[in-house]
Amino acid sequence: MLKDFSRSMRLERSLYKEIAVIIQKNLRDPRLNSFITITEVKLSYDLSYAKVFITFLNYDDKKNIKIILGILQNATGYIRSLLNKKIYLRIVPKLFFVYDTSLINGIFISELIKNI
């Protein structure tokens, strides 16, 4: 028998969807000219913190990655206020944006395998 999804997994999925919509439609910062993709959301055990793993196209240098992460981190209050209107929680988790390197690592490994 399949195990039912836990509350934290359901909440991670809801946060994943809502944060993606908020970033694409509600953030109007001109410095965010890249297509930002959320790859995963991980909640802490007590549901008070959420790590949002993101990746974006055409920005491989660390300087631009830091700039975009800083912009998103500064917008967490606004994002949390919009989340509070869409997802009914007693406490909306504090958001921490982290650049996800799994895509770059996967491309690197694929290139290594191709060159063998």
Curated annotation (Swiss-Prot):
Compartments in which it is found: Cytoplasm
Keywords of the record: Cytoplasm, Ribosome biogenesis
GO molecular function: ribosomal small subunit binding
Subunit note: Monomer. Binds 30S ribosomal subunits, but not 50S ribosomal subunits or 70S ribosomes.
Any one GO CC term of the record: cytosol
GO biological process, one term: maturation of SSU-rRNA
Organism, scientific name: Buchnera aphidicola subsp. Cinara cedri (strain Cc)
InterPro entries xref list: KH_dom-like_a/b, RbfA, RbfA_dom_sf, Ribosome-bd_factorA_CS
Sequence similarity: Belongs to the RbfA family.
Main location: cytoplasm
Parts forming coiled coils: none
Any matching Pfam family: RBFA
Protein name as it appears in the record: Ribosome-binding factor A
Purpose: One of several proteins that assist in the late maturation steps of the functional core of the 30S ribosomal subunit. Associates with free 30S ribosomal subunits (but not with 30S subunits that are part of 70S ribosomes or polysomes). Required for efficient processing of 16S rRNA. May interact with the 5'-terminal helix region of 16S rRNA.
Name of the gene this protein is made from: rbfA
